[in-house]
């Protein structure tokens, strides 16, 4: 259950030796079947109704969540996943995004959310409403379909696509990950492919090549084809309705108490005593402060470990339509 990677300018052989001597050398490699099966495609969209808890005195009006969710390809299809990340921004999560704007204008919810998630074996694209009502479900679905059909028919705004690609390209070139160390982000990106194919850990680092290919496809109908295939003509879809339910927490707590009482009744007095003693020892361990000797084993930073130079922020000067 461990994935180890090294990042930086270092003596790799020395670091691997340290890993072996201090950590991994004490264990034997075992083969584990961590294969994850793909979920079979649905023959038709699946509708799911679930309850979620609200306070007993809280109003249930405009507290329903509605969502449409689409399974979109596979985790190792890197180009398609990057393309859907771009569509996420262009359609839903940028200023003036047509799908978001159409749903906001319909005034059927207090908030429009959603996006693309490629952190699983089968990535998903979701659109959901917060603060809505079940009676708006048909309108919700119709707005999604009508807006997407219009985007396919008229063509997605090429400048919007180009703009998002430029932003992604700039971030990758500059390794601009905010306050997060770039080595950490690179490692997390490796896992997007590495988790599902041990022979493909580096695919997500070829971002510039992928973005270059996607630039060429902006005016060739590629993005519109993705919308048609995965959002308009895709039966591997779920519609989820979350209903507010007053007092649900109390109901679930009572069910848990009944379950625990039944379990306790099935135990012998000796088994109960063991659980009580284990709990007592755990609480003692948690409440006992660490000794000075134990605290001294925690690695500490010195002033020499801190960088004296401040972060360098770069400004880019461009000219557009004669305006600098």
Task: Cite the ranges covered by each PLM segment.
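Non-catalytic regulatory/linker segments of enzymes
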Residues: 111, 323-324
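Short, low-order "capping/linker" segments at domain edges
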Residues: 45-55, 172-176
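Charge-rich, well-structured scaffold segments of protease-associated domains
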Residues: 1-42, 61-77, 83, 89-307
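Edge strands and adjacent loops of beta-rich recognition modules
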Residues: 53-57, 291-323
